[in-house]
Amino acid sequence: MSAKGGKKIQNARSSFDKNIAYDLAEAVEIVKRTSYAKFDASVDLVFKLNLDVRKADQQLRGSVLLPNGTGKSISVLVVTNNVEKQKLATAAGADQVVDGQTLEQKIKEDIFDFDVMVADPAMMPLLGKYGKKLGPKGLMPNPKTGTVTPTPEKAVEELKKGKANYRTDKAGVVHTLVGKVSMDTEKLVENIKTVISLIKRLKPSAVKGTYIQNIVLSATMGPGVKVKIEK
């Protein structure tokens, strides 16, 4: 990292108290103010949860529709051999609608010109053959995130409106996108409250003690800001 880049980080970190957990609106303002990226950075929310991720029922994974969108434009590909579903997906705003044969050719040629794939369930046996290619790129459709569905047009509509995925890692940490630094504070706050409410509802019944141990908000290039956990 350049000396200039290091100084930007130091200045950002010194502009607030990293040991304090801030009210949500104030935390958002700090994140917006301390983002030192030259582009419209993403805003990410991170939860440290008291989970035993070795147990299947404590592995949180899914997607959440943010009321004010993600602020990010995504390219959605739909794969289905059903002609009627292809028409509906196109009408819903899918960027690409392909059949299984076309998709297979794209994968073989390493053409991954899309951000999210939505699949008709009938396509999963085919996609399963390419899990080693799709999985590491985060492109394998999954029922838990709503990207394996008999109604792909609905998934396209939700993704275009602003749907964000979340997933627990091995340390019991959940990351999710909640917007862009250019968004109004009020809109970011509303998005974040939606995610926090969801995480609270998803608390596994077997969890004892403090469930949400820590919440941190940050921009792509910016310091993490602790968020006060409201009971």
Swiss-Prot record:
Any single biological process term in GO: translation
PROSITE patterns assigned to the protein according to its UniProt record, in alphabetical order: RIBOSOMAL_L1
Any one GO CC term of the record: large ribosomal subunit
Keywords: Repressor, Ribonucleoprotein, Ribosomal protein, RNA-binding, rRNA-binding, Translation regulation, tRNA-binding
Secretion signal span: none
Annotated GO MF terms: rRNA binding; structural constituent of ribosome; tRNA binding
rRNA-binding recorded as keyword: yes
Cited NCBIfam families: rplA_bact
Family matches, as PANTHER family: 54S RIBOSOMAL PROTEIN L1, MITOCHONDRIAL (PTHR36427), LARGE RIBOSOMAL SUBUNIT PROTEIN UL1M (PTHR36427:SF3)
Quaternary context: Part of the 50S ribosomal subunit.
Protein purpose: Binds directly to 23S rRNA. The L1 stalk is quite mobile in the ribosome, and is involved in E site tRNA release. Protein L1 is also a translational repressor protein, it controls the translation of the L11 operon by binding to its mRNA.
The family this protein is said to belong to: Belongs to the universal ribosomal protein uL1 family.
Stated name of the protein: Large ribosomal subunit protein uL1
Source species taxonomy: Bacteria, Bacillati, Mycoplasmatota, Mycoplasmoidales, Metamycoplasmataceae
